[in-house]
């Protein structure tokens, strides 16, 4: 009699336990094929609302809907088996009230099978984080630069450059930590401030444009693979340059189709005689 075993996914609790043990590795994923490629190498995959800009060509993440996040979350779940899957709560799906946040987050977990949700916000969202966590929904926090607030902050710029901003980041990070987040993304924050809050928080920090001292790092996959070239943030490193390779492959395909050299006989079905 054989016993079938399935790989056990990393959980939010296991991500939290990595603080002080080793750096946490994370990337974004939006589709099944990419999730399959990333899954063996990362601790958690974030189905980020950045998909609005990367996949849908939106100028900001504000236009992303809950239905979009759920559809892509389902795709990433199908393409992964070991990494913890976290899905962004999109703009407008949680800010109105903690009850609205619970309804949105519960729907995401029930319809995708993911392990946790992420939300942006500082001290003003601490009550919501506590409300979700106390009702069985793990939360990944997000402080510093908050892309969903781009319309009120005036653009994508690093934060922590004056005492007022530093005080806010400290206050926000502590509030979300105290509310029970299993980890906190720290985005676009000057290095000394990101380093400081990493040393003081209970939960791990996940840096993106923050500090190498953060407990982990995350990047948008299409950025680090050199696919999304609309703009390149200072904090992005291209670990590959796939855009030129893709362009060249499509050019070669087009040329072969026009020259009738593709498909070759080996790419066709023949009748056996």
UniProtKB/Swiss-Prot annotation:
<feature type="binding site">
    <location>
        <begin position="49"/>
        <end position="50"/>
    </location>
    <ligand>
        <name>3-methyl-2-oxobutanoate</name>
    </ligand>
</feature>
<comment type="subunit">
    <text>Homodecamer; pentamer of dimers.</text>
</comment>
<dbReference type="GO" id="GO:0000287">
    <property type="term" value="F:magnesium ion binding"/>
</dbReference>
<comment type="similarity">
    <text>Belongs to the PanB family.</text>
</comment>
<feature type="binding site">
    <location>
        <position position="88"/>
    </location>
    <ligand>
        <name>Mg(2+)</name>
    </ligand>
</feature>
<dbReference type="InterPro" id="IPR003700">
    <property type="entry name" value="Pantoate_hydroxy_MeTrfase"/>
</dbReference>
<keyword id="KW-0808">Transferase</keyword>
<feature type="binding site">
    <location>
        <position position="118"/>
    </location>
    <ligand>
        <name>3-methyl-2-oxobutanoate</name>
    </ligand>
</feature>
<dbReference type="InterPro" id="IPR040442">
    <property type="entry name" value="Pyrv_kinase-like_dom_sf"/>
</dbReference>
<feature type="active site" description="Proton acceptor">
    <location>
        <position position="187"/>
    </location>
</feature>
<keyword id="KW-0479">Metal-binding</keyword>
<dbReference type="GO" id="GO:0015940">
    <property type="term" value="P:pantothenate biosynthetic process"/>
</dbReference>
<protein>
    <recommendedName>
        <fullName>3-methyl-2-oxobutanoate hydroxymethyltransferase</fullName>
        <ecNumber>2.1.2.11</ecNumber>
    </recommendedName>
</protein>
<dbReference type="Pfam" id="PF02548">
    <property type="entry name" value="Pantoate_transf"/>
</dbReference>
<dbReference type="GO" id="GO:0003864">
    <property type="term" value="F:3-methyl-2-oxobutanoate hydroxymethyltransferase activity"/>
</dbReference>
<comment type="pathway">
    <text>Cofactor biosynthesis; (R)-pantothenate biosynthesis; (R)-pantoate from 3-methyl-2-oxobutanoate: step 1/2.</text>
</comment>
<keyword id="KW-0460">Magnesium</keyword>
<feature type="binding site">
    <location>
        <position position="88"/>
    </location>
    <ligand>
        <name>3-methyl-2-oxobutanoate</name>
    </ligand>
</feature>
<dbReference type="InterPro" id="IPR015813">
    <property type="entry name" value="Pyrv/PenolPyrv_kinase-like_dom"/>
</dbReference>
<feature type="binding site">
    <location>
        <position position="120"/>
    </location>
    <ligand>
        <name>Mg(2+)</name>
    </ligand>
</feature>
<dbReference type="GO" id="GO:0005737">
    <property type="term" value="C:cytoplasm"/>
</dbReference>
<keyword id="KW-0566">Pantothenate biosynthesis</keyword>
<comment type="function">
    <text>Catalyzes the reversible reaction in which hydroxymethyl group from 5,10-methylenetetrahydrofolate is transferred onto alpha-ketoisovalerate to form ketopantoate.</text>
</comment>
<keyword id="KW-0963">Cytoplasm</keyword>
<feature type="binding site">
    <location>
        <position position="49"/>
    </location>
    <ligand>
        <name>Mg(2+)</name>
    </ligand>
</feature>
